[in-house]
Amino acid sequence: MQLKRVAEAKLPTPWGDFLMVGFEELATGHDHLALIFGDISGDKPVLSRVHSECLTGDALFSLRCDCGFQLEVALTRIAEEGRGVLIYHRQEGRNIGLLNKIRAYALQDLGADTVEANHQLGFAADERDFTLCSDMYKLLGIKAVRLLTNNPKKVEILTQAGINIVERVPLIVGENPKNEHYLATKAAKMGHLLTK
């Protein structure tokens, strides 16, 4: 295990009351969290989203990406389902950090796409480590997942890490004129499945 479970509290939201569970990475002290809705015990697959932190989309309502839209719709679907988990994966900007994300945005303003911008800054297209999420699922006792994602790589990595993903549930939301190039790049260069 790369993580330990350290704290929990109720989190009232517009979608209902979630249980917020905090985790800490053993090696770095970095924190991550899970939002649990309803009773997730048992063998029935749990509707879940692994949502990577995006301050600009999640909290500042940026139209450059689809992240904030995905977060809101994932919480809505989990609440409608009556049970589920949203893992909030604290790896901002596909794990390049907030300041480098701002630098990447500046390069995109000059014509680079999201992948080219990361490469120009010396990063891979995606620096995230999803194995941490596998440990969170295990610590929560989740045996099978219906994963809300458009990213087949996320499904592959979590499956390799021992998570039983029984279904990939598409989450195609938030398309707008400000992010159409970004979404096209995610589909063409990163393999995201964005066709309805």
Swiss-Prot record:
Subunit comment: Homodimer.
Active site, renumbered: D126 (proton acceptor), R128 (nucleophile)
Catalytic activity, EC: 3.5.4.25
InterPro entries: GTP_cyclohydro_II (IPR032677), RibA (IPR000926), RibA-like_sf (IPR036144)
Cofactor note: Binds 1 zinc ion per subunit.
Known function: Catalyzes the conversion of GTP to 2,5-diamino-6-ribosylamino-4(3H)-pyrimidinone 5'-phosphate (DARP), formate and pyrophosphate.
Alphabetical keyword list: GTP-binding, Hydrolase, Metal-binding, Nucleotide-binding, Riboflavin biosynthesis, Zinc
One GO BP annotation of this record: riboflavin biosynthetic process
Residues noted as binding Zn(2+) in the record, renumbered to the chain: C54, C65, C67
GO cellular component terms, A-Z: cytosol
Family in the record: Belongs to the GTP cyclohydrolase II family.
Cofactor: Zn(2+)
Binding-site residues for GTP, renumbered to this chain: R49, V50, H51, S52, E53, Q70, E92, G93, R94, T114, T149, K154
Pathway: Cofactor biosynthesis; riboflavin biosynthesis; 5-amino-6-(D-ribitylamino)uracil from GTP: step 1/4
Species this protein is from: Yersinia pestis
Record field: catalytic activity: GTP + 4 H2O = 2,5-diamino-6-hydroxy-4-(5-phosphoribosylamino)-pyrimidine + formate + 2 phosphate + 3 H(+)
EC class name: hydrolase
Entry protein name: GTP cyclohydrolase-2
Listed GO MF terms: GTP binding; GTP cyclohydrolase II activity; zinc ion binding
